[in-house]
């Protein structure tokens, strides 16, 4: 019976797997810290420049939005573009930290006016002399008289109103907003799931 040469049986020639040294506690903590910091930075960038989920707080946009619903708000289009009339937007008011959700009614250079019909008990908004078609308003509303004299917006001034006109603190009371106060465009409601829908 043949035998293998002794050198072929030498286990010292067999490659040995290198064992990875365990990380020190300091390196482990640093790794976790960097991971968390990166996640926070990414989240801040996304919320500041891309999109943000925001909860409706209040009834100023009924029937378009309901109290407690979660909205998906996009931001890039207002960073590189301009808002349009009828957009549902997220905005900030002077000297207030919280967000507000309103509808954009008039743009810089527009003249906005509100006339009250005593027979029908409704207010009609006019922009540049034309009545604004507002199908999103409640058809059974019984408005208070919120008539307003013609107001011509200056450069970088935007006029916003809530869809629930008798229960909305908006440009009729706080004045026109500046472009820097418009945060994003409400695109859809995603919660509750049963009422998820796009916002035109």
Task: Give, region by region, the residue ranges found by the protein language model.
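Soluble "head" domains of membrane/secretory-pathway proteins
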Residues: 2-29, 45, 49, 54-55, ...
């Amino acid at each position: 019976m043949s035998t293998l040469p002794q050198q072929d049986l030498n286990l010292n020639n067999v490659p040995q797997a290198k064992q990875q040294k365990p990380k020190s506690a300091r390196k482990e903590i640093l790794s976790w810290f960097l991971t968390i910091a990166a996640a926070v930075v990414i989240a801040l960038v996304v919320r500041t420049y891309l999109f943000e989920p925001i909860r409706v707080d209040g009834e100023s946009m009924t029937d378009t939005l309901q109290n407690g619903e979660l909205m998906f708000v996009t931001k890039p289009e207002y960073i590189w573009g301009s808002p349009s009339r009828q957009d549902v937007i997220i905005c900030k008011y002077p000297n207030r930290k919280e967000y507000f959700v309103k509808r954009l009614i008039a743009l810089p250079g527009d003249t906005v006016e509100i006339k009250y019909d005593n027979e029908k008990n409704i207010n009609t908004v006019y922009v540049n002399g034309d009545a604004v078609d507002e199908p999103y308003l409640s058809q059974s509303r019984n408005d208070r008289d919120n008539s307003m004299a013609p107001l011509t917006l200056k450069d970088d001034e935007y006029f916003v109103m809530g869809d629930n006109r008798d229960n909305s603190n908006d440009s009729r009371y706080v004045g026109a907003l500046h472009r820097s106060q418009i945060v994003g465009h409400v695109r859809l409601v995603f919660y509750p799931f049963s009422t998820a829908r796009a916002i035109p």
